[in-house]
């Protein structure tokens, strides 16, 4: 599940996991969980998250590769917010190929104006540190500079499923389900 900040990755990922009866792995949630810990690494992670930045390629890749390696051959999982950089997308694809695991990358597409509106709305509800207005601008830049390349990689591999995220939560979910032929 990929998309701009506020595109609904978490919400749609949870709904898809429920429909499939499987687990969901959220890169953002995992990193926020790690940032709540104690010690040097937790502080470094917290600093990056609070600034709206991305952790190093190797770090993010290590986390989702570890999850992939722990799955049984018939297990299904939804990854939400993974592969935010080209190197991560390539590592995911290489790992999935080695494990003989087919996959689809779902891209929830929304424009930048909608990102700002949704995050402003979410900020009052969830209170995430990475939803501060200056941080949102940086997250949009990070998306444009990095995540867009990962999405293009998946498009060229023929595994990208693009869905408009501009509708009600239920209608977007229905589009995701239809796009995946579920």
Model region roles, listed by residue range:
Residues 1-182:
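Glycine-rich phosphate-binding loop of ATP-dependent small-molecule kinases
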């Amino acid at each position: 599940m990929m998309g701009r900040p506020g595109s609904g990755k978490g919400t749609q990922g949870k709904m898809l996991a429920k429909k499939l009866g499987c687990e969901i792995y959220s890169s953002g949630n995992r990193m926020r969980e790690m940032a709540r810990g104690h010690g040097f690494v937790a502080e470094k992670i917290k600093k990056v998250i609070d600034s709206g930045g991305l952790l190093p390629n190797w770090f993010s890749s290590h986390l989702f590769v570890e999850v992939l390696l722990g799955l049984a051959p018939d297990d299904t999982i939804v990854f939400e917010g993974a592969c935010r950089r080209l190197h991560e997308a390539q590592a995911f694809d290489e790992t999935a190929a080695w494990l003989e695991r087919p996959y689809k990358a779902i891209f929830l597409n929304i424009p930048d104006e909608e990102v700002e509106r949704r995050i402003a709305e979410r900020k009052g509800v969830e209170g995430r540190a990475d939803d501060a207005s200056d941080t949102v601008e940086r997250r949009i830049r990070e998306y444009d500079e990095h995540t867009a390349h990962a999405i293009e990689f998946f498009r060229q591999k023929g595994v990208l499923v693009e869905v408009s995220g501009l509708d009600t939560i239920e209608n977007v979910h229905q589009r995701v389900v239809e796009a995946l032929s579920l």
